[in-house]
Amino acid sequence: MDKGHLPPSRTALRAAKQQPRRSVWKVALATTIGAAAVIFGVVFYASPFESSFPVLVVEEAAESQSLQSEPVAAEPEPKQPVTFTLVAGGDVLTHIPVANSAWNGESYEFSRLMQPVSAYLEGADLALCNMEVPVGEPGAAPTGFPIFSAPYETPAELVKAGWDGCSTSSNHSVDQGYAGLVRTLESFDAAGLGHVGTARSQEESDSPQLYQIERDGETLTVAHLAFAHNLNGLDFPSDAPWAINLNDTARIITLAQQAREDGADLVVVSYHCCEAEYISYPEQQQIDVANDLAASGLVDIMIGHHAHVPQPVELLEGGPTGEGMWVAYGTGNFISNQSTECCVEQSSSGALIYFDVVLDPDGEVTVPEASWTAITLDREYGHVMRVITAQGSEGASTPQETLVRRHSQVAEVIGTVASERTEAPTTDGTTRVVPRNR
């Protein structure tokens, strides 16, 4: 800065530093001629000070006032942790009776059947399901067991119900051949529904489904991976070996590592396994894979599918922060026609598993809590989904004692590590489905 244009406060400070030097010289002069000053009646000592000292006082006061009037920058508010909520649900099985209940005369309105539980999906920042079956041609009637095809509009109906994405790798992935697999992904893309586990190219197979969640000024990037155990003996597309992710722990870890290197804050793995169905405990293969993923330090959450009944929720040692990896060995069915008539009573119910994901100001991501909500199918009311509590479910056609028993079955299996959630979550965040590489 040009010294001839210093601010007034800087000038005042300079005057304050120079003034004492003038005062000392005058004191010395007054001492030398003091006697003469008395004789002539002139207070020579004082007069120079009378012209300068008051100026100094005024300048100091002005400087003080100037310093006091300068605005003081407010301390920025410290950043607070931001909590995101992720919910995982079970198998979407569009059995023919379910599809018939969804038919409104023009289309298959599955979202109407799911409406009673939609708040429990929409209130989460990210909702992930398992699409058990491929979709058929537009306008084609659905098919059921053993070679499934869901109505083409099913993915759009899942979005209306509150889902953000689904795993698509299962033992039914190629029920409609490779063409059906591709059609399923195209229908997901058209609906804006995320998908992972099946692919149309090697590049897509190697790409996780990413979700970017914005909330309270922060962004959380979630990577979703999915794998299945077999294809029910159907032929694997020989010219498209990358079309389905089959269970391979080493590859899961490799893709999880790549996802983190590419910026994922949270890695979720959907694991469709194993041979047995309708059992309420995990098989050894599930346990081994879960422990391997936890030990890798790359996976935050593992979600199990295929058993069609709920299985335990556990917090395993390991995980990215060393504070553990959550595993829900089985989420049961989300929507289906299964019941005691074909299977076991527990197949009429499922669980929505919630995870609290905390993003700290320093950028660290942890998953300190898990919770669950029991759901069931009210077949007597046209396959409408219901949230059930220890008191049953208000408005259901299924007898309340049956609903209370189903809730008890879910609670007993899931265990006590996760707490029960009886109210829907809420969020003011936004979630973006990032298109997978192709």
Per-region residue spans from a language model:
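Acidic, metal/ion-coordinating pockets
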Residues: D2-K17, S23-R438
